[in-house]
Amino acid sequence: MAEKILEKLDVLDKQAEIILARRTKINRLQSEGRKTTMAIPLTFDFQLEFEEALATSASKAISKIKEDKSCSITKSKMHVSFKCEPEPRKSNFEKSNLRPFFIQTNVKNKESESTAQIEKKPRKPLDSVGLLEGDRNKRKKSPQMNDFNIKENKSVRNYQLSKYRSVRKKSLLPLCFEDELKNPHAKIVNVSPTKTVTSHMEQKDTNPIIFHDTEYVRMLLLTKNRFSSHPLENENIYPHKRTNFILERNCEILKSIIGNQSISLFKPQKTMPTVQRKDIQIPMSFKAGHTTVDDKLKKKTNKQTLENRSWNTLYNFSQNFSSLTKQFVGYLDKAVIHEMSAQTGKFERMFSAGKPTSIPTSSALPVKCYSKPFKYIYELNNVTPLDNLLNLSNEILNAS
């Protein structure tokens, strides 16, 4: 039993060796066909271990072909060349600064020679070729594929050359130092593309708008809170309609002294309701010496002045107040005394060389003013600051 098993194993080993030998032959033939049909040959020797085996098999095949040719006299000797060495091509470096990719032109001629030699070869015996007919079909189809690859390479080369020429036409050659010496008056033109300058006034999502006009910014800051829609806390008017009551009272006092007008405290109609307005409609009067005035006459004179005066009149203090102060300072040199007769109910002005009488003060409640000499006399040159006027009124109240 063991002998039979060993015999079967020996038979299997022999069959495996035969199959391996056939596979090596097939691989060898395929590698030979691929080697002869290379489109672009290598410009250097690239030898490996499997190429040495191919070279030995190729030499054996050539020796067999020579023996067959010696038997027949009519057949001529053939030499098979497996290596395609390309011819070196001259490149014009002076004209072109760049070095584009060039494909050798003698590849097509070498391919045609190799295909002609393969066609003229006699048929190899069955031992060298084997029973593979597909290899012959591959060898016939390979030149067509090579032609297609050559056409593609030519089209790529022509496209690269045309692109390089167009770029070379657009870009001008730079001037050398010698050219400038020959033509010193030559005009130099800048061909480089102009840089786009981004404007700083563009509005972006990240950057805010930048205002370069200082006057515009100043007016914007001055008129920022001028037209606000929210009224004040304690008033029913808007900020741009607000009036200064202290300046208004002082102006009325000066006008009454200079122009024989009665003095009355009032506020605009918008800022006070009618109930409070009736309560505060109390007149002020001057007393000179020991003369006394009845309350009824005071009410009559106050009503007459209030009827003649409108509640909505607003005075432009910036224009009139400066002229009034100058006149008032001139009248301070003399004593101004107002007297009121009980019969006519009119004011009369008298001048005397004595001491000046006191100026009446303003308040919301009825005030009794007595004739007392001035302790403090001030010259008003500038009327714009309000703090001086407030301090002046407080000092006059304390003095009285």
UniProtKB/Swiss-Prot annotation:
Disulfide bonds: none annotated. Coiled coil: none annotated. Pfam families: DUF4545. Residues 112-126 have a biased composition (Basic and acidic residues). Residues 112-151 are annotated as: Disordered. Signal peptide: none annotated. PANTHER family: HYPOTHETICAL GENE SUPPORTED BY BC079057. This is Uncharacterized protein C1orf141. It comes from Homo sapiens (Human). The lineage of its organism: Eukaryota, Metazoa, Chordata, Craniata, Vertebrata.
